[in-house]
Each structure stands twice: as structure tokens, then as C-alpha cells.
């Protein structure tokens, strides 16, 4: 099907022709035939790199140029940024694009001036909770990676959000983009959508198992030269010799870092002089962005043409790795499943070096087929590679047979709603009542019966869980005590602040029960909520943290009995996370924190993001309920954002000054932005360097605000910086 033949405005067709897209892929053509451009709901369950995003673009542009507005929902911030960059190319068509992923207690009415809004599912949910007016103008909703409705962490929010959007705008077109799953037909029926299912790919995908020096596919086999003792290194070298690139998936951060180091010396021998120069530049940028041991190791790997990628790296470091790989300079990335989660980063060959992953409940377990398919889908760059290869590495003949039967020849699992538990449902029950989607019990049940959970389970057990949620919300004062579903001011604020009602209840009880409110008291209160992401306890942590608890017992609202092993161990994890935050706000270096707590720089920022948000909630709840702690929590919120002591906050409002530079200025006697404005710039240049000093004084003495500086952009207070189960690896 030719682009020129589509029922689209001429300027849209010309845009794609100018981009070199003349013809649709077969699955795209099928989608058009099934009503994509006629406003029909559609579920596309097709492989990675088969053109799902183009389907979304065509539907959005058709609707927008007819006066509509589009909402593009993604599961991850990184994916939101990637789509935002792509959609900004539509500016030549007069299309305005906005993005929003944080600040969950804002209505963001300003976003409504845009034609395409890119947002995470959590942000979309918060916009609905805050009754954002422009949401009623949405004519097309795109749900990217909709198979993640199966995720215990993020699936319920995506599911309820889609149900609310369909209820609010019954005529709105829903376009759901999914990996190939076992029950796509069931998902399509729930969405009242046409279904496009296909295994077609623009580049051939060869899936197989590597064993004893040979890559075995279904209908062919290929011998690989054994240049080293590591089979995955040999597979990578084989690809590099043919001008390809490799993604290697590992089961843990430790393993992916170790493999990048192991492969470095071999990969380095394949680099051209031009590659080496470019890689040296990337390595220098890595070191400019971070001074931790991990970033130093990453820079060493990058100079040799390899890299590692996991959620322990900060976003700037991950982006430098991704950009270096896209540019063809980095030849091999060793990654945890972060790169399988929707980002557009394909390679000639994908190597799954370990098909098992650790679970705290069950130990090492095989990954789902769906996750394998997501990894395998990264193989083969459209228009660049003649083919793609997805390779599982077997260590024995028994494992070889297992991998072939359970992955290569297997179909992806069915996806199942995870909404049917009190933990998943209580926040959505409160929000549904608070923003008027349901005013009576019958209306609440009618709404919930429109969810995927009710569709799959025929309402089995739903009323029982709903009643448990309602009893909890009434007991905690978030709903009025009578049978009518009327939210209290407490309940409305909890819903608007986008916090789990259980977290809000714990915060309120903690503030009431605390004898005093030290930094540790408030930090631990935040870390005791279910919204918080906790650090793992290592075997040698227990004694140290237990000793700390004994020495500071009076600063905790409640210390559980050590004889209740499960509860006490969880409590120690809360304390460990609190101590990380305590070091953070007292300006310990990131490298020192990483080494002390056995974590990554990216984890520090992720934990601080979540803690900042919950501390913001704590301040707001204390103010509403007239409890002590509102002022203290508000100050700690700022300190967590910057990772600094209170005396540095004024300096940290200047863009370009971080916690380290602010401390240098303060110790040199420049203790506020007002004092800094009166200083000879040469003195600051001697302290921070001429470039930084120039930027600072342009703000202070140039386009300043009424206070004399340009304040940094407000923090994105988001409890969802990463995706659990995948991005936390």
C-alpha cells in the first residue's frame, strides 16, 4: 500500500515521502484496511521494528488535522523522551508537541495548547484525578507497550486509566500497541478494537541456540570461530567482523558489568582510529557527568568499544551509552533487561547469555517467553542490517534442548490483569470516587466492571476486594462513614497527591504518634510507606543497621519486635534506605554512598526522587490535618531534591550550581545569591572555572528574576523514575 494512496492530507503524505517512506509494511497496510484512518479502535500486536509507531503517527495526524488532540501514553520516562523527540519533527506541519512525566499534584492545563501530549500512564492517571479540562478534548489515545497491563506494578494504573478515558470520551479512538502476546484477541475484545496480529518483520530474524561453537536455528546452522574461552565473546567478535553490533543481555548488574570488561580487550582490536577517537570523547563525557567508581569503569570499557547499561547508571550516562551505540561507535552493550523495555536500540545480533533471573521469593527462575521475545526483537536494524540474530547460549545439551523447546519454538504467554487485589485497587477506588467517576456503590461497580480484570474474571471476587478497599478508606477517614461514597477533604487530597492511601494513612499516624521530628524520624516515616523503593539488605548489613537502630531507637515512631523476623527485616530495609537519604542530604559524595550501601548512582537519584515526592506529600498532609511537621517536611523536601544542607539551598537555586559547587562557594565565603552578585567574577572563575562562572553571572546579572537569579526548573517530583521488575535490575 503506497503512502500516496492513503486518506491523509497532502502535507502529511509529503512529509513521509520526504522522509523516504514510500510504502507501508504489510501489518501497517492491514491496520489501514481495518479502519485505522477511519477512527476505529485498533490493537496492533506485532514484533518490534515492524512499524507500530508509524501506525500511531498516521492516526494522530489524521485526527489532529481534522481538529482533534492526541494523547500518547508510555510506560517509561525514557520512552516518553524518545517519542517526544520524534514527534517534534511534525513541527513543519504546524503540530505542537508537549511532554509531561512528573509533578503529580498539578493539573497541567498549559499542556492543553499542544496537539500531541506524551505522558506516562501514571501522569495520565494524575491528570484525570486532578480533573484536567483539556483531557475531555482528546480524540485519539495511543497506549504504547499495552502488554505491560500484565505488570503487577504498573499494569493496574494503565488498565484503570484506559477504562476512565473510554468512559470520559466514548467516541475517542483507542490505538493499543503491543508485543505479540498469547491472548491478543481477548485484549482486543475488551478494547472493542480491530485486531492486527502479525509475525512479519522488515528484516529477517534468525532465532536459535548456540552450543559447542555452533549457532543452531530452526532450518540452518552456523559455525562460529572459537577465538576466546568465552562463547558469548566469540559470538560478539563474529558479528563485529561483519560490521555488525551486539546487545548482550545478562541477569544482573554485576554480570553485565563483568562481561563488558571481559569483552573489552577483544573488541578493542577491531576498532578503527576514527572509532577510538570518537570513543575517547564519549568516555571523557562520562567522566564529566560522574565521578563514581562505576562511571570510571564504564569510561574504561567505552574506550575499548564496549559498555554496560543498567538502572544503576544515571539517565545522562545511559543516554551517552545509547547515543554512542546508535552512532555505531560503541560496538557492544552488555545490559540487564532495561534495553528490552521499549527503547529503540536495535543491533545485528542479540545474545541472551543467561536466561534465568533472580527472584527474592523463588531464587533463580527462567524469564518469561514474552520477555525473551522482547529481547530477541532488538535483533536486526531496519534498512541497515540484512538480517538479525537472537542467540540463547546453552551450557549443556540438556539446556540446549530446553532452550529450543521453551523459547525458540514457544509462543508468548497470555497477559492477565493484576488489578484484583486490595493493594492494587485501593488507590483507584479512591480516585474513581474523588473525581466523580462514581458517586454510588452501583456506579463504582459499573465502572470497575469495564476493566480488563472484570472482563477476564467475569467479576469473580471483585465485590469482595472493593468492599475491603471501601472499609479501609472509611476507617482511615478518606471516605465519609455512611454508605454514600463521599470523599473527605483528606481523601480528596490523597487522591490528588497521587499517593497510595495506605502510605497516606501511615504518614498521618506517624506524625500523630511521633514524640519529636528529627531528620531521621521524617526520613524513616517516608521510607516506611509502600510507595517507597527500598534498598536490599546484604548479609553484612544486618548487624550494623541493628546496632544503629538500638542507638537511635527514640527517633523511630515504632520499632517492631526483632522476634517478628519478617517485619523486623523489612524495618531494617527501611532504616538502611533512610540512612542513604541521611547521607545524601548531608552531602556525602555519590561514590561514598554507592560503596557504603552497595548501590548505583542511578539508584541514589531514583530513591531521592521518590523520597522527595513522599516528603512533599507529608508536608501537604500535615498542613491539611493540622499536624506537626509541615514546615520540617517542606525543608527536607528541598534538601532531598538538592542533596544538601539547608544553608546551601539559596545558592542551589542558581542553574548550573550543584551540591559540590555550592559547597565550594559557601566555604569560600559566598553564602547566598545576593552576595554572589556583588563578587568579582574573577574570584568565582578561580574557584569553579571560567565557563561555569560566566554562566552563573549571566544569570545573576543578566536575565535575572526579581530576586536576581534565574531559578532552576521545578523538580519533577515523581515516584516512578524507573520501572520495577525490569528497570530496577
Curated annotation (Swiss-Prot):
Domain named Helicase C-terminal: residues: 232-426
Record GO terms (molecular function): 3'-5' DNA helicase activity; ATP binding; ATP hydrolysis activity; DNA binding
InterPro entries recorded: DEAD/DEAH_box_helicase_dom, Hel308-like_dom4, Hel308_SKI2-like, Helicase_ATP-bd, Helicase_C-like, Helicase_Hel308, HTH_61, P-loop_NTPase
Keywords, ordered alphabetically: ATP-binding, DNA damage, DNA repair, DNA-binding, Helicase, Hydrolase, Isomerase, Nucleotide-binding
Keyword Isomerase tagged: yes
Intrachain disulfide bonds: none
Motif DEAH box in this chain: 144-147
Polar residues bias locations: 720-729
GO BP terms, alphabetized: DNA repair
UniProt cross-references to SUPFAM superfamilies, sorted A to Z: P-loop containing nucleoside triphosphate hydrolases, Sec63 N-terminal domain-like, Winged helix' DNA-binding domain
Protein residues bound to ATP: 28, 46-53
Top enzyme category: isomerase
Pfam families linked to this entry: DEAD (PF00270), Helicase_C (PF00271), Helicase_dom4_arc (PF21280), HHH_5 (PF14520), HTH_61 (PF20470)
EC number: 5.6.2.4
Region listing for Disordered, in residue ranges: 706-729
HAMAP family: Helicase_Hel308 (MF_00442)
Subunit-structure text: Monomer.
Protein's job: DNA-dependent ATPase and 3'-5' DNA helicase that may be involved in repair of stalled replication forks.
Protein name: ATP-dependent DNA helicase Hel308
Originating species: Methanosarcina barkeri (strain Fusaro / DSM 804)
